[in-house]
Amino acid sequence: MVKGKVTKPVKKATKSKQSAAMISKVKDDFVMTLDSDGEDLEEESADEKEEVEEKPVKLTKKQKKQKLSEADEELLEREKQAAKAGINPDFQFSLDGFAATSEGLDGWNFEVSKDDNKVQKREVDLDSIIKRKGGLLDEDEDEDEAETDVKMEENEDDLAIDGFGGGVQPGKDMDEPEDEDEENKEEVENEEEEDSDGSDSEAEECMHPDDLVLDDHKGPAIDEGPQDTAEEMAAFYAPEEENNDKTESVHKTFQTLNLSRPVMKGISALGYQAPTPIQSRTIPIALMGKDLVAGAVTGSGKTAAYIIPVLERLLYKSSKVAATKVVVLTPTRELSIQVADVGKKLAQYVSGVRFGLAVGGLNLRVQEQELKTRPEVVIATPGRFIDHVRNSPSFNVDDVEILVIDEADRMLEEGFQQELTEILTLLPKKRQTLLFSATMNSSISSLIQLSLSRPVRVMINPPKQAASGLVQEFVRIRKRDHLKPALLASILKKMDKEQRTIIFVARKETAHRLRIMLGLLGVRIGELHGALSQEQRLQSITAFKKLEVPILVCTDLASRGLDIPKIECVVNYDMPQTHAVYLHRVGRTARAGREGRSITLVGEAAADRAIVREAIKSVSESKQGKAVGRNVDWPEVEKLYSKIEEKGDIVNEILAEEKEEKAMLQAEMEVRKGENLLKYEKEIASRPRRTWFQNAQEKKADETSDKRNLLASNKDKMKKKKDNEEVRMYKKTKTDRKEASKRGKPKGKGKRK
């Protein structure tokens, strides 16, 4: 008994020593204040007592109620502190008072981060070659007086362009200059009725005499094949009665769309006040999970119309397993990069949503590493997407729930048919499909291959219509095709250097030659076409967006989807093939309610005049925008032409020097490639061989057929389509042949001889 009494205090003493050692360790880790030392000692002594007498404490009902009331008081105290800090716990998101577009948003980001391209390819510096040959010297600075005279005359020569970057004073009434222009137009018409080059009159009154012959047949550019019948549309599309509540309701604010708060904050960050008509109609339908075929004019907010419902639906996904839920397909790399930037800005407050990019021309390995993480949204071009699905480890599309096809009519063209068919076989059949385009005029027969399930058809604006703020100017070239480069230089010299201008040409060789020629004349200009590397293309767009280069000459690569802010003018150096392509080109300006103008150089081909006639008809029917003729000072153009002819040899020298430098860079790259093959032979040999759904011969055959179809007339295309749609002739089976032999008839076709 005595031993037991002696041992108990010893255990208590050792326990207290251990607790004291722990307390001293805590004191060493934390710096105590003078006021807190005493409090800590009292708490430590209390803790020691609790350790000695460790007994479970049961709370009575009264104590439980008292504890709950203390929690409520603590919650009220927190709310009071939040109110003092200026935070309202009952806050409801409101977008009232925001501008339609944020002034702080300077367009979308096209710059490629350094991590995406660790190995920077050396490119030929064309500007340095042009400078060595005496170009890019800003000849316009020596001709300031001449330019001021030209600008004074521009108000007389160009009809109805005041207010579109043509010298309107801030605060001046926009209606007054238009009335003055109408009066000036009538005066010029009366004075110059017999002018062979045309006068400053409405383009409808400046038609060529041969146009009257073409009124009966609109020409190949307008012939778009048979239209879908009412029965076919009723059988394919969802009935309108099912969606009247969703499609006909007008949402004046985003609040009425019942979007979540993180999505609303992203919308606010971009400065949107109210949904556009296409957004108001399509967002509710997309949130219902229905398939959608939507069309609206360029610059109407179609990208946000499908990004917003996608983000809203991704908020309710399971966050336990990473999986790709959404795939967005676009026809061009630049459009994919722009869509990714729009999505990231809208999703900046949405947690757990990542965007992946899979486009050609950029670092393949970096994209593979990004897709290994299985981002929720993948934005891609068709070819690179198929490449990653087949060859990138840990990336699959088994969980894809939404497929978005931007610029769907372009994707349904023959150039993308093989890739699109392959992608549809890779994706799950149970999915939602959203189609968006500015000219959604594809027939039902082409939409059937997408496996749409009773899609809802939403067409906001009438087809074949340009933006309401666009002034379309037309210049008749007649038999002066050789003066087109000089005419273009004359037009550009009258432009303000602080305004962005896009020039569309038919061929990349023409774009490159125009850049050199205009550079020799002292015009700062960039180029954008398929012959450039992806880095060069993105650099051109970024320089154009930052106004480092105010003029961009490009092919139809840039005619779809690109939203570069404040493009004042579009010049059609070469006429497009169809009116739909024309609408996509001129849609680069006058976007999102802004104003702009287009200048089109019209040749004598029947297809060219048919497109002009269709544009004028659209303006007269919609009573929006203007279509006018533009006067040209041809003597001045001829002077510029002689100047350009003198520099023809220099242009050829620059092209030859550029070709030599490219050959040198290519040789250096081949040497480095050979060195790497020798140095990393085992690593390269151990990599799995990449596969493709087409071999090189099949791909080349498809490209050849695409070129033939592009050059073929619409009549030949319709004949080929009709032949393909014909019912296949019945073919005899083995059973039929046996029965025929029993009846005494010989095998095969034909009568017995």
From Swiss-Prot:
It comes from the Eukaryota. Residues 649-729 form a coiled coil. Residues 1-20, 34-74, 129-205, 691-753 are annotated as: Disordered. Residues 283-458 form the Helicase ATP-binding domain. Residues 36-51, 137-147, 175-204 have a biased composition (Acidic residues). The Q motif is unique to and characteristic of the DEAD box family of RNA helicases and controls ATP binding and hydrolysis. This is ATP-dependent RNA helicase DRS1. It comes from Yarrowia lipolytica (strain CLIB 122 / E 150). The gene is DRS1.
